[in-house]
Amino acid sequence: MTGPTLLSLATAVPENRHRQMEIHDRWLSPYIKSQRARAIFAAAEIETRHSVLAESGFLASEPGTKARNDLYMGAARPLATTAICQALLKAGLNSGDIDHFIVVSCTGFDNPGLDVILAGDLGMRSNLRRTALIGMGCHAGLTGLDRAMLELAARPEHHALVLAVEFGTLHFQHGSSLENMVAGALF
């Protein structure tokens, strides 16, 4: 007896591409006053990252959750749609074939949720089973895959779609705590 199978994988990234050390030097160094910060950013061994932010000005005013979330939702919908359509095409499926839709994020949320919005946009079935894993942090991606595995173990003839949408640069914080420096370097 075989278990669930991964049929495809797809990604979509924001168009703005920044070098890791540029993010430190131009975006964050005015707000993170620590000699260790540059070394932490270099040690992360990330060369480039994509961001919904074209430049650092957004972060200067320490924007609140609403401003950050508005940017998240504006970018999440088209990028998620692109990734989903690519994944479905690679798998030889259409949106109506999806039985379980699991959306994961710790960098944005809305009500109605991205799961409901995308299901409507993509014409998914009205009896679609949805799960939104919001605010769980780094392990949510694995939790989403686990949820899909559990659903498919119970219903092997079904198809599950797991979507993770994360825009970490939206949440850079001012301050020189070790936690803030590591989070800025990694996410």
Which residues does each predicted region cover?
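Acyl-thioester C-C bond-transforming condensing/cleaving domain
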Residues: 1, 74, 80-96, 106-187
